UniProtKB/Swiss-Prot annotation:
This is Small ribosomal subunit protein uS11. The lineage of its organism: Bacteria, Bacillati, Cyanobacteriota, Cyanophyceae, Oscillatoriophycideae. Located on the platform of the 30S subunit, it bridges several disparate RNA helices of the 16S rRNA. Forms part of the Shine-Dalgarno cleft in the 70S ribosome. It comes from the Bacteria. Belongs to the universal ribosomal protein uS11 family. Signal peptide: none annotated. The keyword Cytoplasm does not apply. One of its GO terms (cellular component) is ribonucleoprotein complex.
Length: 131
């Protein structure tokens, strides 16, 4: 009978005490990714609709964005985060829902900024859907 391989454990993640930071919400038509970082840009926690257990077209829904934001906010709360500035990017359905979920999870929102990149007539957009 073969021996079971032993699991190597790396260094444990230390609990930081970071009172305020920045929450980046990247909301596309297919997914929503919420990343919470400290003011230096070091990532404290992140979650996406896919990592929260949604698959396929359900990842693009507002409920999936809410679940992802709650998950990221809970982990940031464990690290001691209380206040966040919110940077929202992208055209997706989960933008406002994710912001409300961050607020509901106990994070105080001090600023909301839309950082969606807008082309000055750059690449040609995809053709319109005909359903």
């Amino acid at each position: 009978m073969a021996r079971q391989p032993t699991k190597k454990t790396g260094p444990k993640k230390q609990k930081k005490n970071v009172p305020n930071g920045v929450a980046y919400i990247q909301s596309t038509f297919n997914n929503t990714i919420v990343t919470i970082a400290d003011l230096n840009g070091e990532v404290i926690s992140w979650a996406s609709a896919g990592s929260s257990g949604f698959k396929g077209a359900k990842k693009g829904t507002p409920f999936a964005a809410q679940t992802a934001a709650e998950s990221a906010a809970r982990r940031a709360n464990d690290q001691g985060m209380r206040q966040v500035q919110v940077m929202v990017s992208g055209p997706g359905a989960g933008r406002e829902t994710a912001i409300r979920a961050l607020q509901g999870a106990g994070l105080e929102i001090t600023l909301i900024r839309d950082i969606t990149p807008i082309p000055h007539n750059g690449c040609r957009p995809p053709k319109r859907r005909r359903v």
